[in-house]
Amino acid sequence: MNPQTDNVFYATNAFTGEALPLAFPVHTEVEVNQAATAAAKVARDFRRLNNSKRASLLRTIASELEARSDDIIARAHLETALPEVRLTGEIARTANQLRLFADVVNSGSYHQAILDTPNPTRAPLPKPDIRRQQIALGPVAVFGASNFPLAFSAAGGDTASALAAGCPVIVKGHTAHPGTSQIVAECIEQALKQEQLPQAIFTLLQGNQRALGQALVSHPEIKAVGFTGSVGGGRALFNLAHERPEPIPFYGELGAINPTFIFPSAMRAKADLADQFVASMTMGCGQFCTKPGVVFALNTPETQAFIETAQSLIRQQSPSTLLTPGIRDSYQSQVVSRGSDDGIDVTFSQAESPCVASALFVTSSENWRKHPAWEEEIFGPQSLIVVCENVADMLSLSEMLAGSLTATIHATEEDYPQVSQLIPRLEEIAGRLVFNGWPTGVEVGYAMVHGGPYPASTHSASTSVGAEAIHRWLRPVAYQALPESLLPDSLKAENPLEIARAVDGKAAHS
C-alpha cells in the first residue's frame, strides 16, 4: 500500500508509523470552491434560522457523537496514540461544549441587542430610533488541531461556536487524524439530516498539501478563519487572510510557554509542588498548549529541593509516543539544540525510538537573558526552570516575556505584597491568570478566556474556548428608523424572543 499518491493519502498508525488501511481524498481548490460556494448559498437562511432550531442542531450533533463514541475513540487512539481514557473525556468535553453553545443560542444573549429610543423633540436635533444587534459573518473556515482530535477539530470549539453564531463551517481536517475527522463529520452530516437542514452548512475537506489550507483562506466566500496550530503555519495563513482583496478576521491560537512564578512561601508550604509541576508538564505527553513551559523561582534551598525532586521524577517518566512523526522529530531536534546551549542543565528520562524522552532544563536568570530563543515553545514533554536571584530579578524577567495563553502564580499570603507587583504585568501578557493551580486544564464555561497577546493568539481580544467564543463570528449591525414590522425579532419593541437587552443604556428584559 502506497501511503501517498496524487489523489489520496493515508493516516499513520501513531504507534508503529505504518499507514492505516483507509484512503482519504486529497481535496484541491476545486473542492474548496464547491464547498465555499455552497456554504455561501445557505449562509443567509442559516444566520436567520430561529434560535431554538439552531440550538437543536447543536444538541443533535452532541448526541450523534456520543452514539458513535466507540468508533471515534478506537480510530483516534490508533491515529494519535492518545489513551482511550483521555479520548473518552474529550468526547464528553466536545459534546458538553456543543450543548453549552446551544444554551447560549437559546438565551439570545449573543444578539447583544441594544435599543436607543427616539426623542423627536430633542434640541438642537431630534434623536433617532437606533437599534443594534449582532449577525453572523458568513461561511467560516476552521483548521483542525493535531493535539485535540475532537475538542479542537471537526466538531470542536471553533465549529461549535461558529454554528451557534449561524455561520456555515468548512473544516480543513488535520492530517494527524483524518479517520477520526471523517467519523465526526458523518455525525454532523447525520445531525443536519435529522434537523432537515442543508448539508452545505458543514463540509469536511481533507488533504496533505498546504495548498488546500491556502485556497480555503483565500476564497472570497470565506468570511473568517479559526486556527489552532504552530506559529509558523498560523502566521503564514494570518498574513494570507489579511492580504486578500477583502481582508478577513483570522483567529489563530499559535504558541505559548505559559510562565509559572513560584514564590518562596509556596515552596515551603507545598511538599508536593514538584510532583504537581511534573504531572502538569507531562500531561498528554506535554502536548497541551497550556503546558507550563517555563518556571521562575528564587535561589533558595527550597527551590533547589524542588528542582532535585522534579529531576528525579523526570528520570522516572515513561517513554512518550507523540502525535505524529513530524512532531516527534521537531521535539527531538529542539530538545537537543537547547541542551547543547551554554549555561543550561538538562535531565532526561529513558526512551527508545520511536518514543521520546521527557526533559527538564534548568538555568539561571543571567543565562535566560542571554538566550531569547529559550522563550520559544517546544511542543512535547519538557519544561525549563529559571532560577532568579531575588524577587526584583523575577519581576524584571516577567517584563521580557511575550504573550501566553496563561500565567500561573504559586504563593501564600506572606508573599502577596510581591505578588501584587507581578499581577499587573501578567495581565498584559496572558489571557488567563491561575493562582495556586496549574494551567493545563481549560474549563469550558462562560468566563473562560483561552487566548492572549501574540504569539499566544492573533487576536488577544477574543477567546477560542467558552461561551464568549461565539462573538468571533459575529459583527454588529445598527438599524436606524426601521419600521417595527421590518426589524429582526431581537429588536422588536415587544421583545418576542424574551431576551435580555439594553434600552437607553440600562438592562431590560422587555
Swiss-Prot record:
The active site is at E253, C289. CDD domains: ALDH_KGSADH (cd07129). One of its GO terms (molecular function) is aldehyde dehydrogenase (NADP+) activity. Its EC number is 1.2.1.4. The keyword NADP applies. Disulfide bonds: none annotated. NADP(+) binds at G229, S230, V231, G232, G233, G234. The keyword NADP applies. It comes from the Bacteria. It holds the Pfam family Aldedh. Keywords: NADP, Oxidoreductase. It catalyses: an aldehyde + NADP(+) + H2O = a carboxylate + NADPH + 2 H(+). Homodimer. Catalyzes the oxidation of long-chain aliphatic aldehydes to acids. May be implicated in controlling luminescence as it catalyzes the oxidation of the fatty aldehyde substrate for the light-emitting reaction. Belongs to the aldehyde dehydrogenase family. This is NADP-dependent fatty aldehyde dehydrogenase. The gene is aldH.
